């Protein structure tokens, strides 16, 4: 993009720096790995090792060359395949977009070819994924790599009919099973799945750090109790915090291999991502978002932009605003059905250009090719989440840009990123853009705005201490957000039950109601005035 910040969204490049280290041997109860390989990935992610030189089976090689169209392994594939093929357990640390999925699928397939063939109905390889979208993507890649093998892959996750999944697993082979933790436990409890994993050969935890961040530790422990101890276990993770180290100590056999494709001197973020931070009044956020995207579209014809928001309602509001502006966008978040989410993800993945409004269902692991810009609007849930979102761009050795847009009350978060190569990017709202956006905001469904208000209240309620807000100040700012920023015709109602769950009972300024008006977002009941700016949303369902 280049240049100084301006109304077209251009910026000057920052300097790079930052580091992150690993100390697995010091984790409580953890044994040091017998094999510790550091292979820092620089620039292009492709290694000099051809797949043909790795001793893979003929059906696997045929799938790699004819279906996947690969010739050479990426660095993480090159470094992890040898120890995995030797039968070692592996903990691999690698950046997003580095080819981790193929890195664990290929040797898992090869492991299936060793020893007696699996009995009909057996699950020989179990892969845990933190999100439905990532599980679907892994399943598709597994099917491609299994094209010329007599093995079958299936996927199960929440949001779909569990009876249909059960029937599909009962009526078809399930050599490879990709699953989200919650739905897998459902099948253990209701589908008599335990006997089918009794001879499990390989367990994979993909995006292990996110599995733990999302609170799946109890589920993982329960899953481990169902499967045999004599198995090969593979942990792939973008970061290796203490939680992951503890899982490694519990799940991996002594003498496991630790493969670090990031290294001590490298930042947790991809060095090919140019990063910017803009702190601007909340009133200006929506206008700046439109301004940034419009400018990027003008400068990059084959643009692909992902905008991340704290939750589903914030995502919905932004998407409806862009529709009101006559700017088509892809919308993906937990309030949409799984069918819609899958279709939207596929459309954006296959598109030559486009803009996606997303909650964190797209933040990890999902491979959207050629994303040129990632914009994060509002407070990320953690430093790790900032990094994972940023990882949607600059994949497979390509370059990309990322911008974090914060309000002054969110600026404390920048301290968590001080070791990353982020440059300040002051920005001003173009008056013409502000006028057009305000008019469009007036056409957004008022119910969408009301839901965004409640979500905003819930989200920032969890960060009051960090922002130095009392509960009274929180409510005052939420009300100003609804009336002055979103332009709601009156103070939105909020259910008494919701207020109680937020711990806001007795706080003055809330419009308590026993029930909310019917109908949902997506219509055009009008917004009662343009308002200015934009906010986050509650930490609702993902």
Where are the model-predicted features located?
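Intrinsically disordered, low-complexity accessory regions that flank the conserved helicase/ATPase core
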Residues: 1-50, 522-542
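Conserved Walker B
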Residues: 181-182, 208-211, 312-315, 361-362, ...
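Non-catalytic terminal extensions of ATP-dependent helicases
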Residues: 4-8, 432, 439-542
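Conserved AAA+ ATPase "SRH/arginine-finger" region at the nucleotide-binding site
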Residues: 238, 258-265, 277-283, 377-380, ...
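Conserved segment of the helicase C-terminal RecA-like domain
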Residues: 388-432
């Amino acid at each position: 993009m280049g240049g100084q910040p301006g109304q077209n969204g251009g910026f000057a490049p920052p300097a790079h720096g930052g580091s992150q280290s690993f100390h697995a041997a010091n984790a409580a109860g953890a044994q040091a790995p017998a094999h510790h390989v550091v292979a820092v990935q620089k620039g292009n992610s492709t290694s000099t090792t051809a797949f043909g030189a790795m001793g893979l089976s003929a059906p696997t090689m045929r799938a790699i060359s004819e279906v996947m169209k690969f010739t050479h392994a990426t660095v993480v594939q090159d470094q992890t395949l040898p120890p995995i093929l030797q039968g070692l357990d592996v903990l691999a640390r690698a950046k997003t977009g580095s080819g981790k999925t193929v890195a664990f699928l290929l040797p898992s397939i090869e492991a299936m070819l060793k020893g007696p063939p699996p009995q009909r109905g057996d699950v020989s390889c179990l892969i845990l994924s933190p999100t439905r979208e990532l599980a679907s993507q892994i399943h598709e890649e597994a099917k491609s790599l299994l094209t010329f093998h007599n093995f079958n892959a299936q996927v199960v996750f929440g949001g779909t009919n569990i009876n249909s999944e059960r029937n599909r697993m009962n009526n078809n082979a399930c050599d490879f099973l990709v699953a989200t933790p919650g739905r897998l436990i459902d099948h253990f409890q209701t589908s008599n799945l335990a006997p089918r994993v009794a001879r499990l050969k390989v367990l994979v935890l993909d995006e292990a750090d996110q599995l733990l961040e999302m609170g799946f530790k109890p589920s993982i422990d329960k899953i481990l109790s169902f499967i045999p101890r004599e198995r090969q276990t593979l942990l792939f993770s973008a970061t290796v915090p203490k939680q992951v180290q503890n899982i490694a100590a519990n799940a991996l056999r002594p003498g496991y291999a630790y493969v670090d494709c990031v290294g001590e001197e490298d930042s947790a973020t991809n060095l090919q991502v140019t990063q910017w931070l803009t702190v601007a009044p909340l009133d200006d956020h929506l206008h700046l978002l439109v301004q940034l995207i419009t400018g990027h579209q003008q400068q990059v014809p084959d643009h692909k932009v992902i905008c991340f928001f704290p939750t589903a309602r914030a995502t919905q509001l932004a998407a409806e605003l862009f529709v009101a502006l006559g700017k088509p966008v892809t919308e993906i978040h937990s309030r949409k059905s799984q069918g819609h989410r899958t279709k939207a993800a596929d459309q954006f993945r296959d598109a030559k250009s486009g803009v996606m409004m997303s909650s964190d269902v797209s933040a990890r692991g999902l491979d959207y090719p050629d994303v040129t810009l990632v914009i994060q609007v509002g407070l990320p849930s953690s430093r790790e989440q900032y990094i994972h979102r940023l990882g949607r761009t600059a994949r497979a050795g390509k370059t990309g840009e990322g911008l974090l847009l914060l309000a002054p009350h969110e600026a404390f978060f920048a301290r968590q990123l001080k070791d990353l190569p982020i440059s300040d990017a002051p920005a001003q709202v173009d008056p013409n853009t502000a006028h057009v956006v305000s008019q469009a905001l007036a056409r957004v469904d008022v119910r969408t705005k009301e839901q965004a208000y409640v979500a905003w209240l819930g989200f920032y309620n969890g960060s009051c201490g960090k922002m130095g807000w009392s509960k009274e100040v929180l409510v005052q700012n939420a009300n100003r957000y609804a009336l002055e920023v979103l332009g709601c015709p009156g103070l939105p109602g909020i259910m008494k039950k919701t207020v109680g769950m937020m711990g806001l009972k007795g706080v003055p300024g809330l419009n308590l109601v026993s029930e909310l008006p019917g109908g949902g977002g997506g219509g055009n009941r009008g917004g009662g005035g343009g308002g200015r700016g934009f906010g986050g949303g509650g930490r609702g369902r993902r």
